[in-house]
Amino acid sequence: MFYFTKYANQKFDILNKHKVYFRREQIEEAIKLPDEVKKKNKNYFAKKDGVGVVYRKGGEATKIITFYPVK
């Protein structure tokens, strides 16, 4: 199960204002099937298809902290 933080939910609108569009499914897929994953402390950094995602695993839920476009 994926949980988007308040900031992560706001990030969709922030990026839309800059004409950068992501769907929730893209963010979730970057975590499920990433091209690259790194870990620093408790946070994981996943990249896939032009999106980077910062998230944290906890029990059954994965908390999505933020996401951003990558080249």
Sequence positions of predicted segments:
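Ribonuclease/tRNase effector modules and their secretory precursors
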Residues: M1-K71
